[in-house]
């Protein structure tokens, strides 16, 4: 019945749910039409007549469709529905398919072309999977079925999920499965699952059912609206698929096969011991409230070695950007483009004064900024250093010149240094120093703790200034519990791992240097040097930026940032590629060099 799909199955059976505009049943019957089948038997229950009318005679040229009605569908489970079709199973070999699946066409060829007569398609366990699991040996013999109530998260490495597509021979159905199913239902009733019969059969000395792993074939089981949303992303095509991924703004753990070169995270931190410490305290942190702003300001001050009165902690830098710009960035606001769009998006559009460097690398110096904005009457100037997405970097000595100029001009200067620890000089280039902040109360520094510290899921960021009244006011703007206990505890223990953090940043710089040289060998890319954890690349041949992004995603499950649609690029073909660890970077390089 699909109750968890809510309104989508209020007046429709589950297989009528549409994925990207196509009902599941239509997709399935079209796939079956391409096979050499004697008939298709559909067991119907809830809204069965509506389903029959929907199917009509549209598939008569390729399929012989028969229906079996389950009049007590609301009191039974799938074991009863299958039992209603047992006579059909006794007549011929059977493909058994559940109606809430979406999968690639090749799945049927995979199971039909395999000579073994009795097979269950299985997929290596991934975190999204729910329901019956199996364990198999090196010969794909099924050792046991693991029902949902016996699932053990400590044993997931040994689990395979049943895809719920089976091939049963006529003999297996007649001599093994159906006799056991009949005995099972007599003993336990009809409100059970047919997989439980297979679990019982595994206790036989000789099990005639083998598993067939599907490898990287795409599939999804749709039980609720979240499943539907994910399935529509996985099974979208081309530009539509890329757009669906981009609109998620993260959460890519739901897509374990996707390699994310879009979002920007240090691959070498935090270290394993720190992760273990966080895990060891998980239960306590999960069940207790975090501290308020006073304690977290103290922790942030300790984290960066600055006065707690100079810093405000946020639920990611994005929260602080919003709070600051919407309230304090009044008057004309200078922005260096291209940039992280959250900054200009939060400002009043009519107040924006845009500086777009006049070169193909989008590079600029402190002197370029001063010369452009000198006569613009700014109240606020903001930019990112190193910049996003260009990777352009203004050295600290030149940045101090810009700080002095804005001070003399009574301009508030906001510098986002979220990527500064990736620079060759590392943390030595930071502006988060009490002496710098205290001497320049017009200076505001934003720093994300997601990027170089490798913990974007914790949603941590800080805003700092020598203007204590400003910081005090910002602390009142955000909620009293604006970060969670896990983020707070991370800040609490960071000091124990700080030396490892600096080692990780140096290791990152080494990999960035290697990766840059390799990227430069891709003939259709012009790679712009970067001091951040990404490269802005111009595509000079073969593809547009959107075509390359779509191709990498559809063929290789690799996600990159298409910058071509951003206004500052004026339709030019630029992409941004994150720097990950060597293994991941080499996978991207192999894909780029194959295209």
Regions found by a protein language model. Name each.
Residues 1-10:
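N-terminal nucleotide-binding beta1-loop-alpha1 segment
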Residues 60-132:
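Conserved beta-loop-beta/alpha segment of the NTase-like Rossmann-fold superfamily
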Residues 104-188:
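Conserved core of the sugar-phosphate nucleotidyltransferase
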Residues 110-114, 363-377, 389-452:
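Active-site pre-lysine segment of PLP-dependent enzymes
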Residues 158-162, 269-273, 292, 442-528:
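PLP-dependent aminotransferase class I/II
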Residues 509, 522-556:
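Conserved PLP-binding catalytic core of the aspartate aminotransferase-like
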């Amino acid at each position: 019945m699909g109750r968890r799909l809510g309104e989508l199955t209020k007046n429709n059976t589950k297989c009528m749910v549409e994925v990207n505009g196509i009902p599941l049943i239509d997709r399935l019957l079209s796939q079956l039409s391409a096979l050499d089948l004697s008939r298709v038997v559909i067991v119907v229950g809830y809204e069965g007549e509506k389903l029959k009318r929907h199917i009509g005679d549209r598939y008569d040229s390729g399929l012989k469709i028969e229906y079996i009605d389950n009049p007590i569908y609301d009191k039974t489970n799938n074991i009863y529905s299958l039992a209603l079709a047992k006579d059909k199973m006794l007549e011929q070999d059977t493909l058994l398919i559940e109606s809430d699946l979406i999968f690639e066409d090749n799945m049927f060829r995979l199971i039909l072309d395999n000579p073994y007569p009795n097979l269950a398609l299985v997929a290596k366990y991934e975190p999204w999977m729910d329901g019956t699991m199996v364990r198999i040996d090196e010969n794909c013999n099924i050792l046991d079925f693991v029902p949902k109530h016996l699932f053990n998260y400590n044993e997931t490495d040994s689990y395979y999920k049943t895809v719920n597509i089976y091939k049963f021979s006529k003999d297996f159905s007649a001599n093994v499965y159906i006799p056991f199913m009949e005995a099972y239902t007599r003993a336990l009733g009809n409100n059970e699952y047919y997989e439980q019969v297979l679990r019982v059969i595994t206790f036989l000395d000789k099990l005639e059912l083998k598993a067939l792993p599907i490898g990287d074939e795409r599939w999804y089981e749709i039980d609720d609206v979240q499943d539907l949303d994910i399935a529509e992303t996985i099974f979208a095509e081309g530009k539509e698929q890329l757009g669906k991924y981009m609109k998620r703004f993260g959460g890519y753990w739901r897509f374990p096969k996707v390699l994310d070169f879009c979002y920007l995270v240090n691959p070498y931190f935090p270290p394993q011991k720190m992760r273990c410490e966080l895990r060891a305290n998980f239960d306590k942190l999960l069940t207790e409230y975090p501290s308020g702003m006073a304690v977290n300001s103290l922790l942030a001050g300790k984290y960066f070695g600055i006065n707690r009165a100079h810093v405000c902690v946020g639920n990611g830098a994005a929260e602080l950007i919003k709070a600051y710009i919407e309230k304090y960035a009044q008057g004309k606001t200078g922005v260096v483009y291209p940039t992280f769009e959250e900054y200009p998006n939060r400002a009043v559009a009519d107040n924006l004064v845009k500086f777009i460097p006049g070169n193909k690398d989008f590079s600029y110096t402190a002197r370029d900024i001063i010369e452009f904005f000198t006569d613009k009457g700014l109240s606020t100037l903001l930019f990112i250093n190193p910049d996003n997405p260009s990777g352009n970097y203004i050295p600290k000595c030149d940045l101090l010149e810009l700080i002095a100029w804005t001070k003399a001009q009574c301009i508030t200067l906001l510098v986002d240094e979220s990527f500064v620890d990736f620079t060759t000089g590392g943390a030595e280039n930071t502006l988060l120093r009490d002496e710098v902040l205290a001497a320049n109360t017009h200076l505001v520094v934003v720093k994300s703790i997601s990027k170089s510290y490798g913990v974007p899921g914790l949603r941590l960021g800080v805003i700092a200034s020598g203007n204590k009244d400003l910081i005090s006011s910002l602390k009142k703007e955000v909620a009293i519990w604006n970060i969670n206990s896990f983020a707070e505890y991370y800040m609490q223990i960071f000091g124990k791992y700080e030396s490892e953090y600096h080692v990780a940043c140096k290791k990152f710089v080494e990999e960035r240097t290697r990766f840059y040289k390799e990227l430069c060998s891709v003939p259709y890319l012009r790679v712009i040097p970067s001091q951040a954890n990404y490269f802005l690349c111009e595509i000079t041949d073969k593809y547009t930026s959107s075509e390359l992004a779509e191709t990498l995603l559809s063929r290789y499950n690799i996600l990159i940032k298409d910058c071509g649609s951003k206004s500052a690029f004026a339709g030019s073909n630029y992409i941004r590629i994150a720097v990950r660890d060597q293994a991941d970077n080499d996978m991207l390089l192999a894909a780029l060099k194959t295209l």
